[in-house]
UniProtKB/Swiss-Prot annotation:
Disulfide links within the chain: C108-C204
Biological process according to GO: tRNA wobble position uridine thiolation
Region (Interaction with tRNA): 154-156, 316-317
Keywords tagged on the record: ATP-binding, Cytoplasm, Disulfide bond, Nucleotide-binding, RNA-binding, Transferase, tRNA processing, tRNA-binding
Listed EC numbers: 2.8.1.13
Protein's name according to its UniProt entry: tRNA-specific 2-thiouridylase MnmA
Binding positions for ATP per the UniProt entry: G17, M18, S19, G20, G21, V22, D23, S24, M43, G132
Keyword Transferase appears in the UniProt entry: yes
InterPro entries linked: MnmA-like, MnmA-like_C, MnmA-like_central, MnmA-like_central_sf, Rossmann-like_a/b/a_fold
Residue ranges, annotated region (Interaction with target base in tRNA): 103-105
Location, primary (coarse class): cytoplasm
Localisation: Cytoplasm
Catalytic reactions of this protein: S-sulfanyl-L-cysteinyl-[protein] + uridine(34) in tRNA + AH2 + ATP = 2-thiouridine(34) in tRNA + L-cysteinyl-[protein] + A + AMP + diphosphate + H(+)
């Protein structure tokens, strides 16, 4: 279902989250063309390193202002750095300290973009907010569903799975019905300053710097041994927090005698002994899981799923939908997959779908081996 037609938009005031990127720029433009009263809001979510080569906030604000000036709308600014630190960044650090690999973008959406920003926009008198996310919404039977974006290469429902239906109901997603090339074409046609601006990648507060350089500013590293699955010590790591399951690059253990030429991969992060367990080969059996246990489940809508139930799931962004059976456990949920899943990583999110509907998801706690003979210590 497309967002309301012009006849439904009379006098509705929408505040668009302007990131300084092309997607939010085109979102604001499209809403104006649909007859909404549109204003923009630029969020500042990070205070550290302002003015350095890593922080693009000033450039992004300038781009957002240029677009707003071009299309003739007001741009508000708001500082949510304190909320971001308390609700996103401290959790990010705690997860890494615990040896897990978190996804701060998911928390940022739930706590900042669809909570702090939404509340602030309502305080400014908005009827609705809008963002440049590649997702869609559908109102049905008194609830609002979150749907995948039409562009399978840009669909961002994975990152919005923890946002509630009540928040989705107050949000418009103008580019969710479009593919990325169409969005850029619209921006170029209207000569928007962001038309050719590259998409942002990675974690926003880290920017282009090395991840390890950033993390060691906040957490003390604990070096330890790198071992094979047979227990042989073949190197040392600088800290388990710098590594993730399935990682190949940056291990520094090449050229070992009688080891063969296959690359090494991270298989296990042994927190108890502060050891990194590695093995050779992209298809090493310890990399594959049959099932996972998840906690901290957020459903977009609190509906009865009549578990166990056949669904599809993603254990990482841009993964194709993986058929699975979801069931309730004592402490959370268990998803059992039809096919082996590679590098299922504790701390990351598993997101569940029923066709094009994003139902919700949770945090991966445990990855179970594909077969008993592949059981890990």
């Amino acid at each position: 279902m497309r967002d309301p037609a012009p006849s439904d938009t009379q006098k509705k005031r929408v505040i668009v989250g302007m990131s300084g990127g092309v997607d939010s720029s085109v979102s604001a433009l499209l809403l104006m063309e649909q007859g909404y009263q549109v204003e923009g809001l630029f969020m500042k979510n990070w205070e550290e390193d302002d003015g350095t080569e890593y922080c693009t906030a000033m450039d992004d604000l300038a781009d957002a202002q240029a677009v707003c000036d071009k299309i003739g709308i007001k741009l508000h600014t708001a500082n949510f750095a304190a909320e971001y630190w308390d609700n996103v960044f401290e959790h990010f650090l705690a997860e890494y300290k615990a040896g897990r690999t978190p996804n701060p973008d998911i928390l940022c959406n739930r706590e900042i973009k669809f909570k702090a920003f939404l509340d602030y926009a309502m305080m400014l008198g908005a009827d609705l907010i809008a963002t440049g996310h590649y997702v869609r919404r559908r109102d049905i039977d008194g609830r609002t569903e979150l749907l995948k974006g039409l562009d399978p290469n840009k669909d961002q429902s994975y990152f919005l799975h923890a946002v509630g239906g009540e928040q989705i109901a107050k949000t418009l997603f103008p580019v969710g019905e479009l593919e990325k090339p169409e969005v850029r074409a619209i921006a170029e046609k209207h000569d928007l300053a962001t038309a050719k601006k590259k998409d942002s990648t990675g974690i926003c507060f880290i920017g282009e710097r090395r991840f390890s350089d950033f993390l060691k500013q906040y957490l003390p590293a604990q070096p330890g041994e790198i071992k094979t699955t047979e227990g042989e010590v073949i190197g040392r790591h600088h800290g388990l927090m710098y590594h993730t399951i399935g990682q190949r690059q940056g291990l520094g253990i090449g050229g070992l005698k009688d080891a063969g030429e296959e690359p090494w991969y991270v298989l296990i992060k042994d927190l108890e002994h502060n050891e990194l367990i590695v093995g050779q080969g992209n298809d090493h059996p310890w990399l594959f899981s049959r099932a996972l246990l998840a906690s901290d489940i957020y459903w977009v809508n609190p509906i009865d799923l009549s578990l166990p139930r056949r669904l599809t799931a993603k254990v990482r962004y841009r993964q194709s939908d993986q058929p699975c059976t979801l069931e309730k456990t004592t402490n959370g949920y268990r998803a059992t997959f039809d096919d082996p899943q590679r590098a299922v990583t504790p701390g990351q999110s598993v997101v569940f779908y029923d066709g094009e509907i994003c139902l919700g998801g949770g945090v991966i706690e445990v990855a179970e081996p594909w077969s008993s003979k592949d059981a890990r210590p």
